[in-house]
Amino acid sequence: MNEYNSNSMQFLNIFKNYKKIWISLGIFIILVFTLFLWFDYSDKINKKKISEDFIKAKVLISEKQLENSTQILTKIITKKDNIYSPLSLFILIDRKLENDENKIIDYFNVVLSIKNLNKEDLNLIILKKAIFISETGEEQEIIKLLNPIINSDSVWKMESLKFLGDYYFSYKQFNKAKQYYSVILSENPENIDLNEIKRKMNIIKNG
């Protein structure tokens, strides 16, 4: 019993000596937990607001209020939301709501800087950027963008190869086009129109 009392006294003395530390640690843990809950709640509120703004922008497009919808979509892009920022960029491009190519490229860079993007979503955005800048004929930049995709097992690998083949085919650089078309034919993907590839390969062969 005396030994038990002695141990209890030692514990109480240790607690008293480090009382401030234990209290500070407890307060710190509570603060961290509270901040976590607040950030989680704030993030959900922000995502809801972005979602509502995205829907509003689409409604405005249907009502032909293009300037207002463009402003909303560009604002969503700057929010760097992993879902709605890329979708907003795609709408800007598909609907031709922004004519300044430099701005579009800047928007691409903003979206590509989003940290929590899914890998395949990131690859799709890279492919779309390559397609966009191909209109200005920046060959080296296109290759730089797409090389990591075509040298991977990405679901966008075949689409990237086809785009590069079509890109060079359109400029009558048939040897380069053949290089990419040949890879596609060797892998026999289901999501690519192989008849079109074979037709172009025949044109290259007979050209």
Which positions does each model-derived feature cover?
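N-terminal positive-inside, membrane-proximal cytosolic segments immediately preceding the first
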Residues: 1-31
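TPR/TPR-like alpha-solenoid signature
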Residues: 47, 51-55, 90, 127, ...
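Short extracytoplasmic
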Residues: 56-87
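Amphipathic alpha-helical repeat scaffolds
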Residues: 51-54, 58, 74, 90, ...
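TPR-repeat structural position
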Residues: 66-67, 101-102, 139, 174
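Soluble extracytoplasmic domains of inner/organellar membrane proteins
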Residues: 83, 96, 110-207
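Inward-facing hydrophobic residues that define packing positions of alpha-helical scaffold repeats
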Residues: 61, 73-74, 89-92, 105-112, ...
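Transmembrane signal-anchor/signal-peptide helices with a preference for the extracytoplasmic
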Residues: 32-52
